[in-house]
Amino acid sequence: MTNIXXSHPLVKIMNNAFIDLPAPSNISSWWNFGSLLGICLILQILTGLFLAMHYTSDTMTAFSSITHICRDVNYGWMIRYIHANGASMFFICLYMHVGRGLYYGSYTFMETWNIGVILLFTVMATAFMGYVLPWGQMSFWGATVITNLLSAIPYIGTNLVEWIWGGFSVDKATLTRFFAFHFILPFIIMALAMIHLLFLHETGSNNPTGISSDADKIPFHPYYTIKDILGALLLTLALMLLVLFTPDLLGDPDNYTPANPLNTPPHIKPEWYFLFAYAILRSIPNKLGGVLALVLSILILTLMPLLHMSKQRSMMFRPFSQCLFWILTADLLTLTWIGGQPVEHPYIIIGQLASITYFLLILVLMPMTSMIENNLLKW
């Protein structure tokens, strides 16, 4: 009798992806985030499903339905907070995963990388629409501000915004369609993640050295299954600490006030994981320019393979590039801080400098440093 692992069509796919997959022997904990993202996605889909059972996507009852979930549904408060804070964990893992890809030159797997960028955009869109659903003040005004940005598109902008709204302002139609999109997108993300994995398994994983590891492979199971389980436990620990002790730490108090179109909150700001992009958007005084900078701040990732000038793939043996990478990290943290601050002196100029630094580092300084390092290799 042939082994089911090698004969059954479905089991064979699972086996080749998670059990007998040849993996480099030296991949570090930075390679854990892929599996953690998968866990986050499954967790978000499950908690989201149970929330959708009790949620109503109507402007009159949306806010009350969230209150009902938290007060009356068995463990509803827990499901709601796991979903809200699960989104934060999702983005922490996402940014770590992308940062790992940048540091170790994983972007040279072009298909995998580009699908990853599409995934990033899709997850961001999903999170934005999810934030609108509780229909609090920040939900309503966040939706108004961000959808309004599309009106900066020449000629079709205004029509496009009204088409997305389903009216002349963010209202009942907007909330209903956002709920529909928020429900469907995670399944699209799941399909994209499978394609992401498919392309990755065509080439095999990268490793910290950036050198081919074909000569030194080990089976994924048990070595990396146990490692992923450890990562999952740590993720669960971090998430449950947030959920059970400080569930509202990362949220906005304004969202506990029902949406009121007649009363604008003093500081409109998105969730923390969008603040860096929001800071870049605000740092340009022109509406269209700001929108372009906002989109380019993420889209610039697709240029990474073209901007790679080094003879080495990874930054492991490139100390100058490492310095710039960590400056970029600090710059993104600075932008995140600025995005949460009011638009006044000195925050405006700090935000503008941080935004310029962001694009300068990626487009000019890092490629130039790579070329200098190439010349140093000749010594």
Swiss-Prot record:
Gene3D superfamilies, per the entry: Cytochrome Bc1 Complex, Chain C
Annotated a ubiquinone binding sites: H201
Binding site for heme b b566: H97, H196
Disulfide bonds: none
Coiled coil: none
CDD domains to which the protein is assigned, alphabetical: cytochrome_b_C, Cytochrome_b_N
Short name of one Pfam family: Cytochrome_B
TM region(s), chain numbering: 33-53, 77-98, 113-133, 178-198, 226-246, 288-308, 320-340, 347-367
Cross-referenced InterPro entries: Cyt_b/b6_C, Cyt_b/b6_C_sf, Cyt_b/b6_N, Cytb/b6-like_sf, Cytochrome_b, Cytochrome_b_C_euk/bac, Cytochrome_b_N_euk/bac, Di-haem_cyt_TM
PROSITE patterns reported for this sequence: CYTB_CTER, CYTB_NTER
Subcellular location: Mitochondrion inner membrane
Cofactors that this protein relies on: heme b
Membrane association type: Multi-pass membrane protein
Keyword Transcription: no
Keywords assigned by UniProt, alphabetized: Electron transport, Heme, Iron, Membrane, Metal-binding, Mitochondrion, Mitochondrion inner membrane, Respiratory chain, Transmembrane, Transmembrane helix, Transport, Ubiquinone
Subunit text: The cytochrome bc1 complex contains 11 subunits: 3 respiratory subunits (MT-CYB, CYC1 and UQCRFS1), 2 core proteins (UQCRC1 and UQCRC2) and 6 low-molecular weight proteins (UQCRH/QCR6, UQCRB/QCR7, UQCRQ/QCR8, UQCR10/QCR9, UQCR11/QCR10 and a cleavage product of UQCRFS1). This cytochrome bc1 complex then forms a dimer.
Protein name: Cytochrome b
Protein source organism: Pseudoryx nghetinhensis
Lineage, broadest ranks: Eukaryota, Metazoa, Chordata, Craniata, Vertebrata
Gene, per the UniProt record: MT-CYB
